[in-house]
Amino acid sequence: MAGTTSTNQYLVIFTLCIACLLGSLHFYEVFPLTLGFQGRWVGVILEGQLGNQLWGMASSHGIARARDANWCWVDTTGRWATYQHYIQWLTSAPRQCENDGWANVILWVFSPYHFISDNGNFAKYQDIFVSSSKPRILMKGMLQSYKFFNPDLPIPFKLRAASMARRWVGVRNITVAIHIRRGDKLWDIGNVAPPLSYYNLAISMLTQLFPQDPQTFVIVTDDPGWVQAQSEFSGMHTLMSEDPSFDMAVIAACKHKIISIGTFGWWGAFLGDTGDNRTSAVIYPTLQMQWPKASGFDNSDYFPQHWTGIDYALEN
């Protein structure tokens, strides 16, 4: 009986080893991190919705480029279906680093990884992501700083809706996009949704900066009801389509951008940024976060220097 028990135990162990080996063989084809395989890699765990996903892609790609490393996305939580939902809007995106299942066991137990988290500093540049001496690093966090990548170099994706959005903007002769984000930002503690006074100030500033430019506006928003209730926005186009990537591409297609809080507006502005504030403007609210989120946010790491910030008073 004892011999049979021992044999069964060995059989279970042998079966587990074979399963691990089979998983690692497929895993090696797409992400050679396990069991000491050679190569420099940067893997990123993407989080959030479209804007946050773009931050993770751009920043991790920039870090991989700085480290002369390969780059991919790691599925450690089985969110592949969610990720596919977002990449359908992009012309290209990082490949999946690994298969789930036994490959995950191999990854976490045997791989000589340097796991780095932003530790709540979601919008602050941290050199540790770039300077790690390990050949393979796995990053987790929002990575919301343009300093992680070179804004002057091409980012590794484009919005599929970009051409359609340019046509949409051109037919209507729109020159200014206003992004108004409210929704969850009204109740999520630490976020500061800009009041109406901010948008009035931004429009006035834009007129002062470019007095000769005709101003035809489109408002891209998640709260069209609130927009329609404001007389200041009367006569402006309002857009909230079923395709967030199209809405983002419309912001990018406009010459000037007035953005709100959140990563969605940031990427809409950045993807259409000329880099020259003498010919076009990106205007943003300087007050983005309050306690408890303010400690993880740095305006100078988040907003490019040539963008224009506006200070405003919060309305009661």
Question: What is each stretch, according to the model?
Answer:
Residues 53-65, 199-207:
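Histidine-anchored nucleotide/phosphate-binding helix
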Residues 14-24, 288-316:
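Leloir-type glycosyltransferase catalytic cores
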Residues 2-33:
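N-terminal signal-anchor transmembrane helix specifying type II single-pass membrane topology
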Residues 33-48:
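Nucleotide-activated donor-dependent transferases that construct or modify glycoconjugates
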Residues 49-50, 77-81, 143-145, 181-185, ...:
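Short, solvent-exposed loop/turn segments at secondary-structure junctions
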Residues 46-55, 187, 193:
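A short, glycine/small-residue-rich beta-strand->loop->alpha-helix junction that serves as a flexible
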Residues 209-292:
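Donor-binding and catalytic core of enzymes assembling or modifying cell-surface/extracellular glycoconjugates
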Residues 40, 76-214, 303, 310-316:
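Secretory-pathway luminal glycosyltransferase catalytic domains
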